[in-house]
């Protein structure tokens, strides 16, 4: 298992030097953030990114992510050209020795929270999702602004894309995902790249949009779309656990049994009323996930891929990108590494 850390490039207040000082840290999870969605990532740009990371004594473990254009998700006629571009990006990454790509198939919005700075009694702040608040939000009126979302939509564009998705139900979205997978995975497999689809976050419909990568049944359906290790998942335990109907340990075990876990996100959350939740510190006692059992499964099934501490709180007065500060994620990384060492030594 390779400990890794998300880095958002030159604009990230967390530097590669900062990350390299975290004990057990080996890899970087990053992307090229200024290439418009749907365009090819050139080998030159990939080489530049790789050289910068390696100059800091680290390696690129995973690309997170190569975004999937909305026209692909909507099944529009333009999707074939966009998929061709996606395939070329996969090939270019493979040519530079990068073999794992995380992506998602969430319509319009990436991960969704209703508050980016909920304050805990100890003064730390965290991301939370309040189901009641979410039902009162209207994305068309610009009430939503979260990291990871495409802020380039005007009000008119947002209305148009939301209207377009009104014609797309879950089965149609599955159909469009299947089309994408059957084009992408043979090409990824041929160049030794493992794709790792990220679950919907949270894993249920929001704002009337369909969401399909939501739990155990979805994973079992997904892996059957194309039978290949290259057609794998990102086991984001915090995302799956944010639906109280999901048993995250059952999901994790089954995903490992299927041999489709290509990347792991370690994040803890504390379930609230209904489908509300708060992101917490990583240790098990602070959330609803038994992180020790998750790491035991990683060891039991011989997982050798990258794992990263996912969203962290803002602590010790740190400011920056919500969920992606240095300090709490560094604590999370060392906590997970400690669990892993304990599991290994305890199994002998």
UniProtKB/Swiss-Prot annotation:
GO biological process: D-glucuronate catabolic process
Cofactors named for this entry: Fe(2+); Mn(2+)
Any one GO molecular function term: manganese ion binding
UniProt feature coiled coil, ranges: none
Family indicated by similarity: Belongs to the mannonate dehydratase family.
NCBIfam families: PRK03906.1, uxuA
Identification of the protein by name: Mannonate dehydratase
Provenance organism: Streptococcus agalactiae serotype V (strain ATCC BAA-611 / 2603 V/R)
């Amino acid at each position: 298992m390779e400990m890794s850390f998300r880095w958002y490039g030159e604009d990230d207040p967390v530097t590669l030097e900062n990350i390299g000082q975290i004990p057990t840290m080996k890899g970087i999870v990053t992307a090229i953030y200024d290439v418009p969605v749907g365009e090819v990532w050139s080998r030159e740009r990939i080489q530049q990114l790789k050289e910068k990371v390696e100059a800091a004594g680290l390696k690129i473990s995973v690309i997170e992510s190569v975004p999937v254009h909305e026209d692909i998700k909507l099944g529009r006629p333009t999707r074939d050209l966009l998929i061709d571009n996606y395939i070329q990006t996969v090939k270019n990454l493979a040519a530079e020795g990068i073999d794992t790509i995380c992506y998602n198939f969430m319509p319009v919005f990436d991960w969704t929270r209703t508050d980016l700075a909920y304050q805990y009694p100890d003064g730390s702040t965290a991301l939370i999702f309040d189901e009641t608040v979410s039902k009162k939000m209207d994305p068309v009126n610009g009430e939503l602004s979260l990291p990871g979302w495409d802020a380039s939509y005007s009000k008119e564009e947002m209305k148009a894309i939301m209207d377009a998705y009104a014609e797309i139900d879950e089965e149609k979205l599955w159909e469009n995902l299947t089309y994408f997978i059957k084009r992408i995975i043979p090409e990824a497999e041929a160049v030794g790249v493992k794709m790792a689809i990220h679950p919907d976050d949270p894993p249920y419909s929001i704002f009337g949009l369909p969401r399909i990568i939501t739990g155990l049944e979805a994973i079992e359906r997904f892996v059957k779309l194309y039978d290949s290790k290259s057609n794998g998942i990102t086991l984001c335990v915090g995302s799956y656990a944010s639906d109280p109907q999901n048993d995250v340990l059952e999901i994790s075990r089954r995903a490992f049994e299927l041999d489709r876990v290509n990347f792991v996100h370690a994040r803890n959350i504390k379930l609230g009323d209904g489908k509300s939740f708060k992101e917490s510190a990583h240790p098990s006692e602070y959330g609803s996930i038994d992180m020790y059992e998750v790491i035991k499964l990683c060891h039991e099934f011989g997982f050798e891929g990258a794992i990263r501490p996912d969203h962290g709180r803002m602590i010790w007065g740190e400011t920056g990108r919500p969920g992606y500060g240095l300090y709490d994620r560094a604590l999370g990384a060392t906590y997970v590494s400690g669990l892993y060492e304990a599991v290994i030594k305890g199994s002998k």
